[in-house]
């Protein structure tokens, strides 16, 4: 299914509108200049080791983009564990395509990270949602959904992506100091 998926993905990514986040766009600017440098470094490392940029892969320039840190949405094929992008957080519009043979391998690859904020997967099988969701070592898991954060639900990660939670009643517990008083009462 990889070829069919990749072709459809590249077509969709090439239609994304990039621009000022306050305008009607799909992709806004990166937070800082060094975020662009990080993406460039990751892409160079990956392509030097055999990955292929299918679309994007460069900073956007020109009158609409000179006042911000805009990067062309990118699809990177043939990504392997030998590449920095497999392990490092990118925080930019890059989709690395990583092939796996079965569900167990996909879970193992996803968990092979020092980070654990959020993970996402798609399925039509409710039993798979329960199994994969429980097996993923992440603080938040989106099944068939990417918008998984809202004020009513706990937000936070595991591993090097944090400890504790924000939002929801679990988030409120982070601000509560529990005090225990032990009293031995005698008449």
Question: For each predicted feature, which ranges?
Answer:
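ALDH superfamily catalytic-core signature
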Residues: 1-80, 109, 143, 187
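Conserved C-terminal structural/oligomerization subdomain of aldehyde/semialdehyde dehydrogenase
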Residues: 14-17, 66-187
């Amino acid at each position: 299914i990889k070829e069919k998926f990749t072709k459809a993905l590249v077509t969709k990514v090439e239609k994304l509108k990039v621009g000022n986040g306050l305008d009607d766009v799909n992709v806004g600017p990166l937070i800082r200049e060094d975020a662009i440098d990080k993406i460039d470094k990751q892409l160079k490392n990956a392509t030097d080791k055999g990955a292929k940029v299918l679309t994007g892969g460069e900073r956007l320039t020109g009158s609409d983009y000179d006042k911000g840190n805009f990067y062309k949405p990118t699809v990177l094929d043939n990504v392997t564990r030998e590449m920095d992008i497999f392990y490092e957080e990118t925080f930019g519009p890059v989709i690395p395509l990583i092939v796996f043979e079965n569900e167990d391998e996909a879970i193992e690859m996803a968990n092979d990270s020092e980070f654990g904020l959020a993970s996402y997967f798609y399925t039509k099988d409710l039993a798979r949602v329960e199994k994969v969701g429980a097996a993923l070592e992440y603080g938040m898991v989106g099944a068939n959904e990417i918008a998984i954060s809202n004020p009513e639900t706990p937000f936070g990660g595991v591993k090097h992506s944090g400890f504790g939670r924000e939002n929801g009643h679990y988030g409120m517990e982070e601000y509560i100091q529990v005090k225990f008083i032990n009293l031995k009462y005698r008449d």
